[in-house]
Amino acid sequence: MAETADTINTTVSTPQPQLESRSDETSCLQKHRSDATSEVTKEEKSGGILFSVWPPCQKSRDYVVNSMIKTLSTDSILSYKYGTIKPEEASAVAKSIEEKAYDIASRFVSSDGIKNLEVYGIETSERMIESAEVRFKANGSMELLLNQTIKMMQLLI
């Protein structure tokens, strides 16, 4: 049996200039790039490179909130198990979850922000599931009682 060696070729290219129409979409990324560039310049003098992903810009935080609202208020894996909630309530819950997760994640000290981002993701996920479970348990008992009552009434008819 003949063995072959696979070769991996990589190409490094410089970023293309941003188009005017996409400037709004990429402003967050550009801000992070400029912040990272200034930090890299400072670190290059001492021989290292520093890149940080924390804190996220407001657009990123808004995206997380909107994703949670969608998950809580429309058909999703979470709503399949726990049911959906009204979009207005989902909005308030999602904003609260995101703020708490952000506060907790901001307490960690990490030079590149990876630990902060990890904690942020874990906190938002766990809090969203806990929130759905609490609402399900609070509403589930009433729904169970209602369903049993309906079944009893159907038997009597």
Curated annotation (Swiss-Prot):
One of its GO terms (biological process) is lateral root development. The keyword Phosphoprotein does not apply. InterPro entries: WPP1/2/3, WPP_dom, WPP_sf. One of its GO terms (cellular component) is nucleus. Residues 1-20 have a biased composition (Polar residues). Residues 37-138 are annotated as: WPP. It comes from the Eukaryota. Keywords: Cytoplasm, Nucleus. Expressed in roots, stems and leaves. Residues 1-41 are annotated as: Disordered. Residues 32-41 have a biased composition (Basic and acidic residues). The keyword Nucleus applies. It is found in: Cytoplasm; Nucleus. Regulates the mitotic activity in roots. PANTHER family: WPP DOMAIN-CONTAINING PROTEIN 1-RELATED. This is WPP domain-containing protein 3. The gene is WPP3.
